[in-house]
Amino acid sequence: AYPAAHQGYPAHVGYARVGYGGYPSYGYPA
């Protein structure tokens, strides 16, 4: 499992990247 994207995360579909706060976002809507 992975942490859900929080509001304000720059998320890109198909890409795992670190968003604000250091948590990864996996294609979740910002």
Swiss-Prot record:
<feature type="repeat" description="6">
    <location>
        <begin position="27"/>
        <end position="29"/>
    </location>
</feature>
<feature type="repeat" description="4">
    <location>
        <begin position="19"/>
        <end position="21"/>
    </location>
</feature>
<feature type="repeat" description="5">
    <location>
        <begin position="22"/>
        <end position="24"/>
    </location>
</feature>
<feature type="repeat" description="1">
    <location>
        <begin position="1"/>
        <end position="3"/>
    </location>
</feature>
<protein>
    <recommendedName>
        <fullName>Glycine-proline-rich protein</fullName>
    </recommendedName>
</protein>
<comment type="function">
    <text>May be involved in the remodeling of the basement membranes or of the vitellin membrane of the ovarian oocytes.</text>
</comment>
<feature type="repeat" description="3">
    <location>
        <begin position="14"/>
        <end position="16"/>
    </location>
</feature>
<feature type="repeat" description="2">
    <location>
        <begin position="8"/>
        <end position="10"/>
    </location>
</feature>
<feature type="region of interest" description="6 X 3 AA repeats of [GA]-Y-[PAG]">
    <location>
        <begin position="1"/>
        <end position="29"/>
    </location>
</feature>
<keyword id="KW-0677">Repeat</keyword>
